[in-house]
Amino acid sequence: MPMYQVKPYHGGSAPLRVELPTCMYRLPNVHSKTTSPATDAGHVQEPSEPSLRALESRQDDILKRLYELKAAVDGLSKMIHTPDADLDVTNILQADEPTTLTTNALDLNSVLGKDYGALKDIVINANPASPPLSLLVLHRLLCERYRVLSTVHTHSSVKNVPENLLKCFGEQARKQSRHEYQLGFTLIWKNVPKTQMKFSVQTMCPIEGEGNIARFLFSLFGQKHNAVHLTLIDSWVDIAMFQLREGSSKEKAAVFRSMNSALGKSPWLVGNELTVADVVLWSVLQQTGGSSGAAPTNVQRWLKSCENLAPFSTALQLLK
């Protein structure tokens, strides 16, 4: 018998029903249509500011330009790797901005460095068996821009140098003291496999190859080009040195086709101004005999335009 008797708290014989919770806290359904919107809408993205939209527009323009430049470089690469393809590189991309040329002489200190009053002397070693005509043309052009002290020497490695090569700079009578010149240009006829250049014997390695030296010398004119024109100019210089000078007859024919196409659209290879591409290609054509009557019509016209300029006609006399 129990000590205490307690009445059951549920009704008689009815089953016990206990509602157990399924979550710790109950919240209203946020997806319900009847639910009022949240008062704190700080997490909602605000409309973009005008400055942000302008930045996005600039980004789109830059990306579009990069894609166009990539297409131009890919096209030039295709022409170099497949020299038999008749590819018109001038139509790959037209420059949005015209080529601008500086009319004032470039500050040589910005390119050659400061020598604290010493004359900046460019020294070139060249083989008389293959005179670098492009460098002689550029020398004459430099003389029109700067006061250049020009000298010619002969190295002991060569025995006989033609008289016209010894006088390739003309009669050099020094009328001024050395420190009054802006630039020194020393040419040494030497038995070297490739043309070499130095302008600071103590601090730099030599630049080798006629094309590379021509690029450097032409940079002293301060000529400015956009990225597309610079790519085309470098491509033409490489084509001259590797395909036109050392390539097969098939490669040379492809170069003539590309030149003829480019010169049909502009008086010079890249635009309306003379560039280092014209100088180097003209030099290689003269050295390899490619300037004969077999050249296409536009190339023949371009050759005459080059030879009408005094620096080209003077250099051409060295081959006679």
Swiss-Prot record:
GO terms for molecular function: molecular adaptor activity. It is found in: Cytoplasm, Cytosol; Nucleus. Keywords: Apoptosis, Cytoplasm, Developmental protein, Differentiation, Nucleus, Phosphoprotein, Protein biosynthesis, Ubl conjugation. GO terms for biological process: apoptotic process; negative regulation of cell population proliferation; positive regulation of neuron apoptotic process; positive regulation of protein ubiquitination; protein ubiquitination; protein-containing complex assembly; translation; type II pneumocyte differentiation. Residues 82-162 are annotated as: Interaction with PRKN. It holds the Pfam family Thioredoxin_16. Phosphorylated on serine residues in response to UV irradiation. The modification Phosphoserine is found at S36. It comes from the Eukaryota. PANTHER family: AMINOACYL TRNA SYNTHASE COMPLEX-INTERACTING MULTIFUNCTIONAL PROTEIN, AMINOACYL TRNA SYNTHASE COMPLEX-INTERACTING MULTIFUNCTIONAL PROTEIN 2. Part of the multisynthetase complex (MSC), a multisubunit complex that groups tRNA ligases for Arg (RARS1), Asp (DARS1), Gln (QARS1), Ile (IARS1), Leu (LARS1), Lys (KARS1), Met (MARS1) the bifunctional ligase for Glu and Pro (EPRS1) and the auxiliary subunits AIMP1/p43, AIMP2/p38 and EEF1E1/p18. Interacts (via N-terminus) with KARS1. Interacts with EPRS1. Forms a linear complex that contains MARS1, EEF1E1, EPRS1 and AIMP2 that is at the core of the multisubunit complex. Binds FUBP1 (via C-terminus). This is Aminoacyl tRNA synthase complex-interacting multifunctional protein 2. The gene is Aimp2.
